[in-house]
């Protein structure tokens, strides 16, 4: 579903496109964190929280851009391939499509939940088709906080996808997430370092399984 105009600016979509073509890593202290399976992950310290913002660049082979974007937007299918999803659904709030997402955390930590806006645009950049998906946390009275679950108030993600010229997808992803609570920042950063590449690998695997089903 398309969100109402105004959830994200035109400029934000084109910024994600631009990063896919030319990574914007200069002028800030972005550090190369890890390179694995054709994926490079950079991080930048957010001094206010002690947490890191992440930028991911790479290629997912044998997974077409359109299919990858469709799978990312398919909340029902994500419940099948993402083992950390406790609850995930879309709801109309004030004329906009809002996503509610509860994530399983290991005991004894409380689960986290998110309420966020998400929008997809398929753009034409000099004849190249680029799928861009933007997401950011929001608050809606209709989706209030739940007892025993910690609401994530700071969440932002950008995803830009185009063909790698073969059967795969060239991908750029930006990610920032502050899970709140009493989890030490070093543990959050350790989890993100592993979780970000694993998420992309899981999504690539979901592409393969989806193709087998159809």
From Swiss-Prot:
**CDD domains linked to this entry:** START_STARD2-like
Tissue expression from the record:
Highest expression in liver, placenta, testis, kidney and heart. Low levels in brain and lung. No expression detected in thymus.
Which positions carry Phosphoserine?
139
The UniProt record lists the keyword DNA repair: no
Q: Name one GO cellular component term.
A: cytosol
Which subcellular locations apply to this protein? Cytoplasm
> According to the UniProt entry, where is the signal peptide?
none
Q: Which organism is it from?
A: Homo sapiens
Q: Which domain of life is it from?
A: Eukaryota
Q: Which PANTHER family match?
A: PHOSPHATIDYLCHOLINE TRANSFER PROTEIN
Q: Does the keyword Repressor apply?
A: no
Pfam families in UniProt: START
The START domain extends over: 1-212
- What's in the keyword line of the UniProt record? Acetylation, Cytoplasm, Lipid transport, Lipid-binding, Phosphoprotein, Transport
Function noted in UniProt: Catalyzes the transfer of phosphatidylcholine between membranes. Binds a single lipid molecule.
Carrying N-acetylmethionine, the residues are: 1
- Annotated binding of a 1,2-diacyl-sn-glycero-3-phosphocholine, by residue: 72, 78, 157
Indicate the quaternary assembly: Interacts with ACOT13/THEM2.
Q: SMART domains per the record?
A: START (SM00234)
Which biological process annotations from GO are given for this protein? lipid transport; negative regulation of cold-induced thermogenesis; phospholipid transport
Any single GO molecular-function term of the entry would be:
phosphatidylcholine binding
User: Under which name does UniProt file this protein?
Assistant: Phosphatidylcholine transfer protein
The gene name reads PCTP
